[in-house]
C-alpha cells in the first residue's frame, strides 16, 4: 500500500469532465487490452476468451476489461494460489489449475515468491527465454497436459474463441504447439515473444498456421487469423 501511495503523485489524473470522458482504463501490462478493444470493438458482450498463464484476475490481465463487458472464458495457470482469487473476482470464468506442455505428465514448477509473474515450468529440451539471476524459492512437481486436451474438455462444442492470450515466460511456443488449431482456432492471438524478431520460432509458428501479425505491443505480438483478416482489420475500421 505504501508503494502504491508513493506512486500516486506521478500518475496523470483527469482534471476536467472532457478528460474524464476520454479516459481509457487498461489492466494489461503493456496496454494490450486497448489494442484488442480497437480490433474487436465495444459492442460484443457475450464473447469468449482463453487466457493461458493468466496470473491474477485483474493485475496484468489482458482479459479483465472484457470480463467487465460481459465476456467469459477459460483461465489457465499452474499456480494454485490464484484459483480462489479468480473464483471470487471472476466467477463467470473457469479457472484451470494446470501446467501446459506438449504431452501429459508431471514437470517441475519453479516459483519465485517476490516475482510470481515469473513462475515457470522446467521443460526438458526447452529453454525459457526468461532468465532470473536468483534461484527459485520453491520447486514442486505438478501435473501438465496439452492445451488441446484442456480446451477439448472445457470449451463448449462449436464455441468460437474470440481471442487467446498466452504468457508463459518464454515457453509460449510450447503452448502453441500443444493446441489443435483445427479444432480450437482463436480469431486473435496475443502471445509474449521475448525474441521480438519476425524470424523467431513463435512468430514463424503463427505465420505457418495462417496468422498474420497485426501489431507489436512491447513484448506482446498480436496476430489475427488470416482467413478473417479483412473482417477484423478492415471492416472494423468503418464502424
Task: Name each region found by the language model.
Residues 1-239:
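Phosphate/nucleotide-binding beta-alpha loop and adjacent structural elements of enzyme active sites
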Amino acid at each position: 500500500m505504501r508503494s502504491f501511495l508513493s506512486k500516486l503523485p506521478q500518475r496523470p489524473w483527469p482534471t476536467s469532465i472532457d478528460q474524464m470522458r476520454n479516459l481509457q482504463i487498461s489492466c494489461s501490462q503493456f496496454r494490450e487490452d486497448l489494442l484488442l478493444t480497437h480490433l474487436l470493438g465495444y459492442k460484443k458482450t457475450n464473447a469468449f476468451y482463453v487466457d493461458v498463464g493468466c496470473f491474477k484476475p485483474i493485475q496484468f490481465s489482458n482479459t479483465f476489461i472484457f470480463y467487465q463487458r460481459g465476456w467469459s472464458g477459460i483461465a489457465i495457470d499452474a499456480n494454485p494460489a490464484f484459483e480462489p482469487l479468480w473464483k471470487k473476482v471472476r466467477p463467470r470464468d473457469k479457472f484451470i489449475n494446470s501446467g501446459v506442455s506438449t504431452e501429459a505428465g508431471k514437470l517441475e514448477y519453479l516459483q519465485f515468491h517476490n516475482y510470481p509473474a515469473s513462475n515457470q515450468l522446467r521443460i526438458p529440451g526447452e529453454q525459457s527465454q526468461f532468465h532470473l539471476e536468483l534461484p527459485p524459492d520453491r520447486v514442486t512437481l505438478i501435473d501438465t497436459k496439452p492445451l488441446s486436451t484442456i480446451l477439448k474438455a472445457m470449451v463448449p462444442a462449436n464455441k468460437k474463441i474470440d481471442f487467446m492470450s498466452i504468457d508463459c515466460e518464454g515457453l509460449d511456443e510450447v503452448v502453441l504447439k500443444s493446441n489443435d488449431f483445427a479444432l480450437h482456432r482463436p480469431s486473435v492471438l496475443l502471445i509474449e515473444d521475448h525474441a521480438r524478431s519476425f524470424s523467431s520460432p513463435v512468430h514463424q509458428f503463427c505465420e505457418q498456421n495462417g496468422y498474420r501479425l497485426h501489431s507489436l505491443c512491447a513484448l506482446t505480438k498480436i496476430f489475427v487469423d488470416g482467413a478473417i483478416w479483412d473482417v477484423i482489420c478492415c471492416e472494423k475500421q468503418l464502424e
